[in-house]
Design a protein with these regions (language model features):
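Start-transfer (signal-anchor) and selected internal transmembrane alpha helices
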Residues: 1-30, 225
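Transmembrane-helix signature of polytopic, membrane-embedded enzymes
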Residues: 12-18, 90-98, 102-137
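Membrane-interface alpha helices of multi-pass inner-membrane proteins
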Residues: 28-31, 130-144, 158-189
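Short acidic/glycine- and proline-prone juxtamembrane loop motifs at membrane-interface regions
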Residues: 38-40, 142-152
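Short hydrophobic/aromatic helix or loop-helix immediately within or flanking a transmembrane segment
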Residues: 44-53, 64-90, 105, 151
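Hydrophobic core segments of transmembrane alpha-helices in multi-pass, intramembrane catalytic enzymes
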Residues: 51, 107, 111, 134, ...
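Hydrophobic transmembrane alpha-helices
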Residues: 78, 82-86, 112-119, 138-141, ...
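Transmembrane-lumen/periplasm boundary regions of multi-pass, lipid-linked membrane glycan transferases
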Residues: 150, 180-251
Length: 251
């Protein structure tokens, strides 16, 4: 007697729109209710943002012209979000929550992108485990809406890892280098080391598959994108933030 073999059930896959909504709820709650955990966030980022938008604020030695170890680019990007919100609701509280909600939304978009790549490249069950962790993890809850360069680097690292996993249409080496480079240039420089294991794998696969030429081209393409980002960041700091600070200081 012949028995008809049934195919195994497909793994459960949460649609991307539901995933985005779940991440938005979690990160939105963090933006509205999570306390600020680090004094560095207050004095090195919220105070300079207040300075750019309102003309006064406290200054740490790290932003002092004597030392200048921090770039104003990261702060100015978020100050622009707060300034745009002030045109809708003229309130400093509204600016504060607009920036935090913007951070939460950005994190949710990056989480959804990485979840999608994990489900397609690995397995939907692994993607579901990842989603469960990022939604209910206390660390991710606080980091998702934190106004810190390491948070920005976390966003770009998720996008870089998503590009590394997503091999549809071929490897996205240049895109991966660009995302990690953006995180290192604008966010936290030491995070650039995160790309080293990924590049090692790309090098091994490239030489084993006897396609070193395309790999070298992709690496040079990614390096050129990072160079363009670095030049753009310097020009933005020189021609936008620089004159603003000069007028504010009264030089």
């Amino acid at each position: 007697m012949w028995r008809r073999l049934s195919s195994p059930p497909l793994p459960f896959y949460l649609p991307l729109n539901i995933t985005l909504y779940a991440c938005l709820i979690s990160n939105g709650l963090a933006a509205l209710f999570a306390p600020i955990q680090d004094c560095d966030e207050v004095f090195n980022f919220w105070e300079p943002t207040h300075y750019l938008n309102h003309g006064y604020g406290l200054q740490t030695w790290e932003y002092s012209p004597v030392y200048s170890i921090r770039s104003w680019l990261y702060v100015s990007l978020h100050a622009a979000v707060g300034k745009a919100a002030s045109f809708i609701v003229n309130s400093k509280v509204a600016e504060f929550y607009a920036i935090r909600l913007f951070l939460g939304f950005s994190c949710a978009a990056c989480q959804t992108r990485l979840y999608s790549s994990i489900c397609r490249s690995l397995n939907p069950r692994i993607g579901l485990l990842f989603l469960t962790i990022v939604i209910f993890s206390p660390g991710m809850f606080h980091a998702s809406a934190a106004f810190l360069p390491s948070t920005f680097t976390m966003y770009t690292s998720m996008l870089g890892l998503a590009g590394f996993l997503d091999i549809r249409g071929g490897p996205k080496t240049a895109q991966v280098i660009m995302w990690f480079g953006l995180g290192a240039i604008v966010g936290w420089p030491f995070a650039g080391a995160l790309i080293i294991p990924l590049l090692v794998e790309e090098l091994v696969i490239g030489f084993l598959s006897q396609t070193p030429g395309s790999l070298v081209y992709a690496i040079l393409d990614g390096a050129a994108r990072c160079l363009a980002i670095g030049v753009g960041a310097d020009l933005a700091a020189l021609y936008s933030v620089g004159p603003l600070l000069t007028r504010s200081i009264g030089c």
